Amino acid sequence: MSEAAKKSVISALEANEALHNSFFKYDAKAVEANAKKLKNAINAIEDKDVTKLLNFSKGKLSEIKASNDRETNNKNYHLVSMALIHIVNKYDVGSKYNAYSCPMVKKKWVQNSSKMAKVHNPYAPNMPHCGSKDTTH
């Protein structure tokens, strides 16, 4: 992956941080707005292999709406997160971003480990710190 592509992927992961935070606090309007920002960041990635891997995610990000119930948005975010986890595991994008999962809700996400050492589960408000760090990059 070129340095330019790496920078654009990191920009997308940074946009995902904002989306992760809005899911963690669950602010429906912020969830929709940050989903759009992540989609725009993905659109800015020019590496063909990476964009192919994230193409499905763009559609799922478009389906994340403030008017949806939380579970619908959680399902779409989980699908987006699975693609981002694949990117983080396949390419060297630095050590900040790692894959996390919660066995209770059976969902995964990418989290900035350097900013948040503790698990921040974006799916389960009743279990905000349930889950585990699955990778160490």
Pin down the residues of each PLM region.
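Intrinsically disordered, low-complexity terminal tails/loops enriched in metal-binding residues
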Residues: 1-137
